[in-house]
Amino acid sequence: YGLEKEKAPSLKQNKSKHVNAIEYHEMLKDKDSVVIDVRNHYEVDIGRIEPPEGGATFLNPEMRNSREFPKWLNLPETKKQLEGKRVMMYCTGGIRCERASALISQMERVGDLKETKGIAMVRGGVDRYLKTFPESGGFWKGKNYLFDLREAQMAEKEGELETTSKCCACERAWSKYEGK
């Protein structure tokens, strides 16, 4: 996160909870929750969790990299959105959530953030969520960007893929990210 060593959050003091994909899916239906996508903005552009109507509020930090997350968390409007809510988060496989949840936990501990109703992350990230809901995708829309030769992962829904993004040059629907 680009934080100085003494300001870096401790994973040992992290109070967040790992939940399985089925429990996470149910939590997305709770209107007293917010869900944060802690991936980079280009990953969010091609696919993301869209909580059901009347459920959790989706928050997108719109980060280019993880170093921007602490700045976003410290914005007054972000703090207000998290206050008194269950904070849920997800990333591709769970690693970025470990760090992000530790930072939120630390902010609560030192009084930089008013208390939430807890912090939860889906065990195994989007990868596990999609494997748990292989046909429907659960509340997932679009593709899950992968940093390997597979490039993306998606639910096995029948019919066409719901495209969630546009080409930055021509504005046509586009669901592939090429980081070249």
Question: At which residue positions do the language-model features occur?
Answer:
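Rhodanese-like catalytic fold shared by cysteine-dependent sulfurtransferases
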Residues: 1-17, 25-33, 40-88, 95-180
